[in-house]
Amino acid sequence: MSWIILLIAGLLEVVWAVGLKYTHGFSRLTPSIITITAMVISMALLSWAMKTLPVGTAYAIWTGIGAVGAAITGILLLGESASPARLLSLGLIVAGIIGLKLSAH
């Protein structure tokens, strides 16, 4: 169950990371509320997952999901670069996430 909670926390990290772009420095109300809500829930779920998962593993996976998810969202929806080097780098992060999951107790 902790792994599912961690996955949801990571996906919410993507929401708030991308949401930051639309807050315009927290000057736009609706995007700011959505972003802050996603931040709070993401952190709460991360904390909950860390009750049974190793801290280093959980945090690294959470940030990895957020980083890869935000980058893919940027590529697919925001017209950001999808260069081979960038895609390879994202693949390496995914490989690291998988390795951490497989090596966890």
From Swiss-Prot:
Keyword Cell inner membrane in record: yes
Coiled-coil features, chain-numbered ranges: none
Periplasmic side: 50-57, 103-105
Domain of life where this protein originates: Bacteria
Molecular functions per Gene Ontology: transmembrane transporter activity
SUPFAM superfamilies per the UniProt record, alphabetical: Multidrug resistance efflux transporter EmrE
Gene Ontology CC annotations of this record: plasma membrane
Record-given protein name: Guanidinium exporter
Organism, as annotated: Salmonella typhimurium (strain LT2 / SGSC1412 / ATCC 700720)
